[in-house]
Amino acid sequence: MENKFQFDKSAVNPSAGVRGNTFPIAEKFSMTDKVQYAEGSVVSKIIIRNERGNVTLFAFDKGEFLSEHTAPFDAILQVLDGVGEVIIDGQSFILTVGESIIMPASVRHAVVATEQFKMLLTMIK
């Protein structure tokens, strides 16, 4: 089947909304391959950041965490690999690959890697 859709990549500003142009524009890629685990660390990579929000990949080593905090906007967390615990307003949720949770704006939340854990965080303003 012939693809009649034509997309001119040269018409796209390759750095618009993409930090450091490290992520392909109009090309497929694997989210889990774009962020690697580091011993004793939380690694994050911003995929998109602009005035309307941001999309960030995270890789947590086992036992690592993001301490309790609030955010001014709703966010959705999607688990890409491993198992993590998300605590929202004191309530604990264990999430595994393929599961997601919405964290409401201005509500205290934290993330803990119960084992090595990769997630995609999308925050929309």
Regions found by a protein language model. Name each.
Residues 105-125:
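Ligand-binding loop in jelly-roll beta-barrel domains
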Residues 54, 83-85, 92, 108, ...:
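Structural motif
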Residues 90-105:
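Short acidic-glycine-tyrosine-enriched beta hairpin
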Residues 80-81, 96-97, 115:
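A cytosolic small-molecule/anion-sensing beta-strand core signal
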Residues 73-85, 89:
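Glycine- and acidic-residue-biased ligand/ion/polar-headgroup-sensing regions
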Residues 1-52, 87:
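A short, N-terminal "cap"/entry segment at the start of jelly-roll beta-barrel domains
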Residues 40-42, 51-71:
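Conserved short histidine dyad/triad with adjacent acidic residue
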